[in-house]
């Protein structure tokens, strides 16, 4: 643990199209080398592509996908008497969102499609349908928590 006091959380500004702070966080996560306008272009183009592919509003698919990705439980390492246990703990709301966004961008980049717009659109559609690599990551996290349920009484 750090001996300093906790860092102040800086609030992000809502994005221009949807006026949503979560969208801004996803755009910031997609962004590489500080090129925010390119990241915005990728995200908004992916939303348009989703609407074109599914016929539903891209923003609604995005919201559903993010809700499906958010983990309720995760495992945390806890050292007790020379042994390290993976202790299942509930995830706070802000960490749920952070993990969901992190997993989304990580597994979007790992996809095989050509171009980030296609990758992001495909991963969001898959996640909205409870499919894809991000949902698999969430399920793997749940399996780890279930396997280590015996250590749940060790609070982290």
Curated annotation (Swiss-Prot):
Gene: rpsG
Known partners and oligomeric status: Part of the 30S ribosomal subunit. Contacts proteins S9 and S11.
Matching Gene3D superfamilies: Ribosomal protein S7 domain (1.10.455.10)
Residue pairs linked by disulfide bridges in the UniProt entry: none
Keywords: Ribonucleoprotein, Ribosomal protein, RNA-binding, rRNA-binding, tRNA-binding
InterPro entries given in the database record: Ribosomal_uS7, Ribosomal_uS7_bac/org-type, Ribosomal_uS7_CS, Ribosomal_uS7_dom, Ribosomal_uS7_dom_sf
Source organism of the structure: Fusobacterium nucleatum subsp. nucleatum (strain ATCC 25586 / DSM 15643 / BCRC 10681 / CIP 101130 / JCM 8532 / KCTC 2640 / LMG 13131 / VPI 4355)
Family: Belongs to the universal ribosomal protein uS7 family.
Name by which UniProt lists this protein: Small ribosomal subunit protein uS7
An annotated GO BP: ribosomal small subunit assembly
Cellular component terms (Gene Ontology): cytosolic small ribosomal subunit; ribosome
GO molecular function: mRNA binding; rRNA binding; structural constituent of ribosome; tRNA binding
Any single Pfam family the record assigns to this protein: Ribosomal_S7
NCBIfam families per UniProt: rpsG_bact
Function of the molecule: One of the primary rRNA binding proteins, it binds directly to 16S rRNA where it nucleates assembly of the head domain of the 30S subunit. Is located at the subunit interface close to the decoding center, probably blocks exit of the E-site tRNA.
């Amino acid at each position: 643990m750090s001996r300093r006091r906790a860092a102040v959380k800086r609030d992000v500004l809502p994005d221009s199209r949807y006026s949503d702070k979560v969208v801004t966080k996803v755009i910031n996560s997609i962004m590489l080398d500080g090129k925010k306008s390119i990241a915005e272009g990728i995200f908004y183009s992916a939303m348009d592509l989703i609407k074109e592919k599914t016929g539903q509003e891209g923003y609604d698919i995005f919201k559903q996908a993010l809700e499906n990705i958010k983990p309720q439980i995760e495992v945390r390492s806890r050292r007790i008497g020379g042994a390290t246990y993976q202790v299942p703990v509930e995830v706070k709301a802000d960490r749920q969102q952070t993990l969901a966004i992190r997993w989304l961008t990580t597994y979007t980049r790992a996809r095989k499609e050509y171009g980030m717009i296609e990758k992001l659109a495909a991963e969001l559609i898959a996640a909205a349908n409870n499919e894809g690599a991000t949902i698999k990551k969430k399920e793997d996290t749940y399996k780890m928590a279930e396997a280590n349920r015996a250590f749940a009484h060790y609070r982290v």
